[in-house]
Amino acid sequence: DVLPEGLTWRIHDGYIRTTTWDAEGESITLGIWGPGDLVTNAHSGLDPVEVQCLTTVVVEQHNPSDAETLAFLLQQIRNTEEIFEINRIRSAERRLLMLLRWIGLRFGQVSSRGYRFSLKDMNLTHRALAEVCGLTRVTVTKNLNRYKTLGLLQQVSEVDLFIPSEGLALAI
């Protein structure tokens, strides 16, 4: 589903991705947003910008104050810069691992031992991960399996994944 254009929404539950397209029609992820975040396409200079629901979401229309708008724009810039930086990593293996780390930092539970998060709860399929970081679905699937074999990614429950800090430090 897509949220209506030009409005600002506060996310209470669920996850949203903002995207645009290049001249060839390839999707470009501008940001991923979750509970507590504001999201809008009203301040973008790009056309089109689509606000896509990754999961079922609970949102409310919000009229942000000037301070909230500034905070939102700064967060949007940070989010886009971080995704851009990840996408500039040449190695597909390292790029996907850094994307998973970013997801863990941004939306997961962070501890001194590592990052715990759920791709399933965010509805980030292998295809969706591939779109975010400019890889193929097959490459994402192969790398996820490889990370699990190497211990860089651990399945800690049916839906939760864990990236241990020490394994990540070795991979970086």
Where are these regions (language model features)?
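Regulatory nucleotide-sensing modules
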Residues: 1-13
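Short, acidic, Ser/Thr-enriched surface-loop or helix-capping motifs
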Residues: 11, 22, 148
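Short beta-strand segments in beta-sandwich/barrel cores
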Residues: 14-20, 38
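Surface loops and adjacent helix of pleckstrin homology
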Residues: 21-23, 44, 62-64, 158, ...
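Cyclic-nucleotide recognition modules
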Residues: 29-83
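Polybasic "coupling" helices that flank or enter modular domains
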Residues: 71-132
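Phosphate-/nucleic-acid-contacting segments
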Residues: 108-172
